[in-house]
Amino acid sequence: MVGGEATSAVEKLVSGVRQAADFAEQFRSYSESEKQWKARMEFILRHLPDYRDPPDGGGRLDQLLSLSMVWANHLFLGCSYNKDLLDKVMEMADGIEVEDLPQFTSRSELMKKHQS
């Protein structure tokens, strides 16, 4: 019955992934595009086991959601943040593939062009 056990294991895995995605869906912002949400959801799901709230609370999940927004805002909107914070979220997002990102010009880059 190895085939039956393998099928059961796959069904459990698929069910677990579906439950995790359904859980994460509640955190989607109404203003997020499908592309932004898929990237942020991957960020959340990747780190969810490390940021589950302990039974007495603690706000770990809120921290993860905030980090996911920092990453998404930097990536998709060009927002800038403290270097340590940005380094942390970029490290957390390592390996998440996002295509066709917008290109942003910083204020200092604009000033350099203007002064030339």
Curated annotation (Swiss-Prot):
It comes from the Eukaryota. Keywords: Acetylation. It holds the Pfam family XTBD. The keyword Acetylation applies. Residues 24-116 form the XRN2-binding (XTBD) domain. The modification N-acetylmethionine is found at M1. Interacts with XRN2; the interaction is direct. Belongs to the CARF family. This is CDKN2AIP N-terminal-like protein.
